[in-house]
Amino acid sequence: MSEMGFLRSVAAVLLLAVFSHAAVVTENGLPIQWRKAPSDLSHLPISNTGVQVNPWVYSQRMTMLKMVINATNAYMSSMGPGEQENPLWSLPLQLGWKLKSGRLADPTPDSSSTCGSEASDPVCISPLSFFGCVNYYLSVLPFLAAVETGVVSSGGHQMLIQVPAEVAQDYCSSYSDCSTKHPNTMAKWHLFFQSLRQVSQSKESDFNKKDSILGLMWAAEEESIQTASGACTERQKLYSSPEVSFQQSSVNLGAFISAAHYHASIERSGKFMSHLPSRVLQEADSPPNIADLSTEENHALYMLSWMNSINQLLGGSLVDLWRKAMCSAQAREKGQAFLDDLILDPKFPGSSLWSIICVMSTSC
C-alpha cells in the first residue's frame, strides 16, 4: 500500500471512530434543551382570547410536556423513588432525540431551511417533518387533555394552539376540536389523566398501581401514534425508503411496548433511545451495515425492521400473539425486560422472540 493509501485508510478509521457513536438524547441527564423551556404558561403569549401556544417552536412544545410531567409527579410514587421515574419522561426525550437526529427538519430535497436544527433561532419544528407531525399527537393532545381534566392548571385561560394554515387539515387546535376529530384518542388521554389521582390513592399495592397507570398511559400513547401515522403519512413521500421503513417499524414497536406497559423512566427511556439512529437514513443505508452508525444503532434498526417485516408477513398476528402473552402484570414485567434485551443487546438472538411468546402464552 502506498503512503497516500495508508494515510487515507487511517483517516477513514479515525472518521469512523468519530462518527460511530450512540445518539445523544440528553443534556446533563435531562431532555435536550429542557432547562430552556419555560415551566408555566406565564412565559407564553397571552391575549384577550387565551394563551397562544405555538407547538412549531421547539421550546413551546417542550413547555407543554414539562407542565404535564411536573403536574403528574405527585401521582407517580408507585413508579419508584424520585421524579425521574415518571413514565411520561419518554415524551420529551423522544422530542429531544428527534431534534438531535435531524428528524424535525424540513425533509424537502435541496431545502435551504434551517428549521428543525439547533442552529435555528428560535429552534423551530418543520410542519413537513414526519416525526414532528407524529410528535404533535404525543404532546399537544395529552397537554390539552391534562388541562381539560384540571391536572395542569390553565390559570383560567383558554388554550389556543397555533397551526400553520397550509397544514391545518392534519391537526386539531383545541380540546373540543381534537375531541371532534379524534374522539378515541382524546377519550383515552382524558381517562388517563382523570384516573391518575384515583389509582394513586387506592389501596392497591404499588406494583398493581404502577401496572394500572402504565396501562392507561400506553393505551393513550398507542392510540395517539396510530392516529398520527394516518394523519402524517403524506410526509413520508419526502424521505428515503430506509427512513420510511424505520418510521413504519417505530410505529410497530409502539404496539409491543404498549402491550408490555413499558416503564419509560428517564434513565430507561434515555438508554433505549440512545440506540436509535442518530441521523436521518439515506437510500444507500442498509442496516446492520451502516458504517457511520454504531453497532448498537445498527442492531436496533435491524431488529425493528425484522419485527415489522415478520408482523406484516403474518398479517399482524405477531403483535396479536405478543398482546395475548402480556396477560398479567408479571408477564408484562418480563416482557419489558425482554424488549430491552432484544433491542439493546446486539448479542441477543432475535429468534428467541418466538419461544418467549410461546412460553409466556402458556402461563396465561
From Swiss-Prot:
Q: State whether keyword Isomerase applies.
A: no
Tissue expression from the record? Detected in all tissues tested, with the highest levels in serum (at protein level). At mRNA level, only expressed in liver.
One Pfam family, short name = Leg1
Q: What is its main location?
A: secreted
Can you list the GO cellular component terms from the UniProt entry? extracellular space
* N-terminal signal peptide: 1-22
Q: InterPro entries in the record, alphabetically?
A: Leg1 (IPR008499)
How does a null allele present? Morpholino knockdown of the protein causes a small liver phenotype. Morpholino which can simultaneously block the translation of leg1a and leg1b, causes a more severe small liver phenotype with hypoplastic exocrine pancreas and intestinal tube as well.
BP GO terms, sorted: digestive system development; liver development
Keywords on record: Developmental protein, Glycoprotein, Secreted, Signal
- Give the subcellular location: Secreted
Glycosylated residues in this chain: 70
Q: Write out the similarity annotation.
A: Belongs to the LEG1 family.
Q: What does this protein do?
A: Involved in early development of liver, exocrine pancreas and intestine, probably through cell cycle regulation. In liver, its function is partially redundant with leg1a function.
What is the name attached to this protein's record? Protein leg1b
Organism of origin: Danio rerio
What is the gene called?
leg1b
